[in-house]
Amino acid sequence: MKKVHLKIDGKEVKAEEGMTILEAARSVGIDIPTLCYHEKLAPYGACRLCTVEIDKNGKTKLVTSCVYNVEDGLTVKTKSPKVERIRKMLLELMLASAPVLSERAGEYGIEKPRFESDLTQCILCGLCVRYCAEVKGANALTFVGRGKNRRVAFVDEVVNTGVCMDCRECFNVCPTGKIPRETDGASFEGITVQDVLAKAGSK
């Protein structure tokens, strides 16, 4: 496999061609925060928390490191002032929906989110949807609605026909950590993940 030479946070890195910046960074112990990334799934780039700043031929720009492949001569900054500002803003937005992110938010000096709280706590990262489709092959979850009405919903046709194995693994990958592992055998027909979260939050 051809090797690609780049620099990440001042460190010379040799990475395999086809690797993403995120993979290359982690291979040498450089931490880039993520929420929607999962090693079993294809890169998605939804949460944007893994944004980094790259310098390519003297031109700088921000890219999502989980979907951007390494290139020869690339210079990457994972903690530039611009990157830190963006991560802080993203975390504040997500913290309003998922208080469990408070530990990561604390790293960026966020004590209290500026944004209105959404008690459903779903951050729409898509991990549960993608895990169900790519790993389990069930496609029992999907996105519905647009904009502020966007939600993750169970697909009735799949749930009702038994294609959904009721494995609850989609709950386990949720980065908010707020979906209950046990739901008392409740049916998921006609409800959304947000409904499950809201019910759990009311207990």
Functional labels for PLM-detected ranges:
Residues M1-K11:
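Eukaryote-biased recognition of intrinsically disordered, low-complexity regulatory segments
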Residues K7, V28-I32, N69-E71, R87:
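Flexible, acidic/Gly-rich N-terminal and inter-domain linker regions that tether
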Residues R48, V52, G58-N172, G177-K203:
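Fe-S ferredoxin-like electron-transfer domains
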Residues V13-L62, R85:
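N-terminal cofactor/phosphate-binding cores enriched in small/glycine residues
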Residues K11-E12, N160:
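A generic secondary-structure micro-motif detector
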Residues G10, H38, L119:
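Aromatic-flanked redox-active Cys/Sec active sites in thiol-based oxidoreductases
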